[in-house]
Amino acid sequence: PVSSLPSKYGIGCFSKEAYEFVDCLERAGQSKWQVLPLGPTGYGDSPYQPFSTFAGNPYFIDLDTLVKEGLLTQDEINACYWGDNPTQVAYDAVFWYRFPLLKKAHARSEYREEQGYEKFCMDSWFWLNDYAFYMALKFHFDNKEWLAWPEDIRFRKKEAVESYREELKDEIDFWKFLQYKFYQQW
């Protein structure tokens, strides 16, 4: 899987290492690479228990590409602890450091003005809004399972849904941005 590629940022991603691996496969006469599963992982980081069938794992977004796009600085990335061994996934480091960096990239991006973003949202209408809302709620409730959320939102009561959509609109937007970046790089 992508996550098992060597990386200086805690987990394999859509980085130059991925492209180098594809080149290696080609030189070896291989025409296929089993990259699945690509979904966003939850507690325990099992790729077989993703939060969504359609969403991509934000861990796979290449931070160096975000630097090239002017959304992050190399100093910001280097200030993070990514684990001691680039050949082993450092899930704790990835969780605690990657999301704050991705939030900075989101705040600096003008992606809403890109035609590609609007098209991505339109093409992904059948899953993106619900996924982004769910993830915003999950982080709002300290990553607790949905059964531990307040009853009104757990049962998707209209007033609660409307209230949380308004309260968490920036967070919802962040999760949409992550999916846009994932699919741009994928």
Task: Locate the predicted segments by residue.
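Acidic/aromatic-lined carbohydrate-recognition and catalytic surfaces
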Residues: 1-186
